[in-house]
Amino acid sequence: MCVIDRSSTIQTRRLTLRAPANPDAARIGALAGDYAIAKMTTRMPWPYSQGDADGFVARCQVQDRRRDSTFVIELQDEGVVGVLGFFTPSDGHLEIGYWLGRPYWSRGLATEAVQGALAWAKSDWRKKLVVAGHFVDNPASGQVLIKAGFLYTGVVEPKASTARGETVATRMMVWLA
């Protein structure tokens, strides 16, 4: 496995994915302060404060890039619109997660970001398998993953949602290069 350079960027038709920097925290905080976003993630707290955003960016800057890599998603002429990350849980299978600010939903941006990130993971990180999941009450995320080439595994796992404070049924998916 290669070590991921902090300067790694992914370019797609409309997006640039790059490592979060300190100035991004204000925009992340503004977008992530929406319960509709937080409740569809496993890790995002609610309410989401500026301190949470600052801490998130600081943690991203010290990630073990042999196992994990987080990107802000920038839309041309609009700046940061969301976050995408790869992380390696204890089972060892690389997992992808993402979120977009509500003004950027239903524009194909999540699909474009995930597709670009998967191409990068395959070419730069030499990954041939990536897993993902979406809460059963978030079928739109499932559609993003299907469009990016993921398939349902048939497994539904309980996953904790920090924002909800409860476990949520999660449909698991896999992408094979």
Label the model's feature ranges.
Residues 22, 47-50, 67:
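Generic alpha-helical scaffold signal
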Residues 32, 41, 64-65:
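Hydrophobic residues in alpha-helical segments
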Residues 36-59:
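Conserved GNAT-fold acetyl-CoA-binding loop/helix
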Residues 58-72:
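A short helix-loop-beta-strand connector motif used in the catalytic cores of GNAT acetyltransferases and
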